[in-house]
């Protein structure tokens, strides 16, 4: 798998 951020992307 790839890198998964633990926080959502800011708008």
From Swiss-Prot:
Modification sites for Pyrrolidone carboxylic acid: 1
GO biological process, alphabetically ordered: regulation of blood pressure
Localization: Secreted
Keywords assigned by UniProt, alphabetized: Hypotensive agent, Metalloenzyme inhibitor, Metalloprotease inhibitor, Protease inhibitor, Pyrrolidone carboxylic acid, Secreted, Toxin
Major place of residence: secreted
Organs and tissues of expression: Expressed by the venom gland.
Molecular functions per Gene Ontology: peptidase inhibitor activity; toxin activity
A GO cellular component entry from the record: extracellular region
Known function: This peptide both inhibits the activity of the angiotensin-converting enzyme (ACE) and enhances the action of bradykinin by inhibiting the peptidases that inactivate it. It acts as an indirect hypotensive agent.
Similarity comment: Belongs to the bradykinin-potentiating peptide family.
Protein name: Bradykinin-potentiating peptide 11a
């Amino acid at each position: 798998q790839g890198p998964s951020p633990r926080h959502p992307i800011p708008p």
